[in-house]
Amino acid sequence: MQKIFSRRSFIGNIAKGSLYSIAFSSSYRSFANPSSFKSFEDDKSKKINIGIIGAENSHTAAFGKLFNIDNIFPGLEVKYVWGETEAFARIAMKKGNIPNIVSHPNDMLGKIDALIVDHRHGKYHLDAAMPFLEEGIPIFIDKPFCYRKQKGEEFLSKARQLKTPVTSYSSIAHSFATFDIKNQISQMESKENIIMYGPLDLDSKYGGVFFYGPHLIEPLIYIIDNRAVKVRVNKNNSNGSASIVFENGISVTLIFSSKNRGWQTFVETKKGFVEIKATVEKKVPSKSDLDMVTMFKTGKEPRKHSNILHGIAILEALEKSVNSGGWENVDQ
C-alpha cells in the first residue's frame, strides 16, 4: 500500500497545473454530442465506474453503500476512493464495500467514468475536480460546490467550454420533499414572510456558514425561485439567526438551531405562522441520487450553473455579515 497523500500536498500539486477561463452565463444544458463527455444513454449494458475524492465525510461511505451494497443503480459501482488520510479511506472502503484505495486522486484518471468530490470543506473541491473536468469526466460535487463564487464561475465556464457535465446541490434541497413544499407555498395567497430552522455552526472549522449553510440556503433558492439581494446575520456565539431579502419582496428569517438536526419551514398567513410539511413519502432512489446518476449516464445537468453560483454568493454574503455585523449585498 502506497502512502496516502496529505490534503495539503494534493491541493498544492493540483493547483500548480490548474488553468481557468472566465465567463458568466448559464442555462439548463444537455450534452447530447459533446466532444469529450461520452454518453451511456444508448448503451444500457455499459457499466459505469465511479471514483470518489474525499473520505472524511460520512457521505462517501453512504455513496459506497448506495451503489455497491444496496445496488440501487445496477451497472454503477464505486471502484476507487481517495482519502485525506489512510484511516479515512479505509473506513469508507470498509463501510461502502469500495474495492480500491488510491494514493493520489489522479491515479483514478483513465479508470473511472464518473467522479464524486466529497471534501468536508468546499475550498478543496474545484482544484481536486479540475484534472477530471479536463478529461470530460462527469462530476458531482457535494455541497458546498465551492468556497468562492469567482472561482466557481471560472470552473463552470471551463466546464461549458469543454462540454463536461457538472452539477452540485444539497441533498436536503434537491429532494422530492423540497419540491413538494415549493408547490404548496406557490399556491398560498400570502408568502411574504418565511421562517426556516436548521442546524448551522458559524464557527465550523469546515468553512463556517459554508458547511451546513447549503442545507438552509439552497432550499430557499428552489422554493422562492428568485434572487436574494441582501443578508444580515445576528451572531450569538457560534449560533444565531439571519435575515435574507429577495428581489420579489419576500423576507426570510433563518434560525440556526443547535439542538435539533432537522429542518422546518414556516410561512406567515392571516392565522399566524404555519409550518409547511412535505406531503410526499420518502422514495428510493432519492431525487438527489437519481438526478446525479442520470447526469452520469446522459450528461443532462439537473441544475443551472447560475443557480449553483447564486447559492455560493448568498453564503459569501452571510460570511461577510458574520464579520461586519451589518447588512451585506449578495453579489449578482
Feature annotation, model-predicted:
Residues 94-156:
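Beta-loop-alpha module in the N-terminal Rossmann-like domain of NAD(P)-dependent dehydrogenases
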Residues 146-206:
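A contiguous active-site-proximal alpha/beta segment in oxidoreductase catalytic domains
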Residues 233-237, 244-312, 318:
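NAD(P)-dinucleotide binding in Rossmann-like oxidoreductases
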Residues 320-332:
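C-terminal capping/lid region of NAD(P)-dependent oxidoreductase domains
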